Amino acid sequence: GDVYKRQSLGRQQVDNYTAIFKAPFSSKEPLLLVQGNYQGTTVQDGIKVHFTPIPTNLNSTGLKDLELAVNVGSQCFYTSDESLLTWLPDQPYTKGSWGYIGGKELSTQTEIRRTADGPLFQTLRNGIEGYRFDVPRGVYEVELLFTDIFLQNEGIAYQLGREGEQKSRENTFGISVNGKMLEEKLSPCKESGYCQAMRKKYIITNDTDHIDIRFHPASGTCFLNGIKLRNIH
């Protein structure tokens, strides 16, 4: 079997059934072991973690097989039970790296339909201006995640029907990448419905040193729930 070098991460207090440890992974498949005490009995569990490190400077290394997924509008990691892909916490853009441009975090506790990744769609960046990745030339797949949650604040109008529905559908915006328009007037609520998950995928040929995604308000607000960048070749 596999042989692992043990390294203790110390002890942490449990708060609301959660204990947080900082684990400095040094291999691509580390084994995490946890041990505790329950009613006088020692209990333990373990899991082998599969991960690919993402460099801060995306131009500093070869990005073959890069798959960078971001939990937009959230400071939390999220791992999908379906794909097992981990979505990283959001961050502001800095030169040479990646991140959002403009907007504010917003979240909802309303159940999101048409997805098994509800928590991923319950956070967003409202009023977002753009998202940028400073990556080498190549062909990339960009996936954008949307859920119109804004009728939560118009609950009475929404329950009454058409008036609330119309207010949400006013959230319409365009999307461009490196100056080229991909969507003229995208309305997530019109396409998928209120609090319904929607994913959009685009193949981008990047002939510069960056992928600069911009959102252009047509009516209402621009928002983004998640984004994934995958290097194709």
For each feature predicted by the language model, list its residue ranges.
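Surface-exposed loop/edge segments in extracytoplasmic proteins
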Residues: 6-11, 43, 180-185
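Compositionally biased, intrinsically disordered or flexible polar/acidic segments
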Residues: 50-233
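Short, small-residue-biased leader/transition segments that mark boundaries at the very start
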Residues: 1-4
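Surface-exposed, short loops/turns at beta-strand junctions within beta-sandwich domains
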Residues: 22-28, 205-207
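Short glycine/proline/serine/threonine-rich loop/turn segments at secondary-structure transition edges
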Residues: 25-31, 151-155
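Aromatic sugar-binding surface patches on proteins
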Residues: 10-20, 194-198
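Short, aromatic- and glycine-rich surface loops/edge beta-strands on solvent-exposed regions
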Residues: 29-38, 211-216
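Edge beta-strands of extracellular beta-sandwich domains
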Residues: 40-54
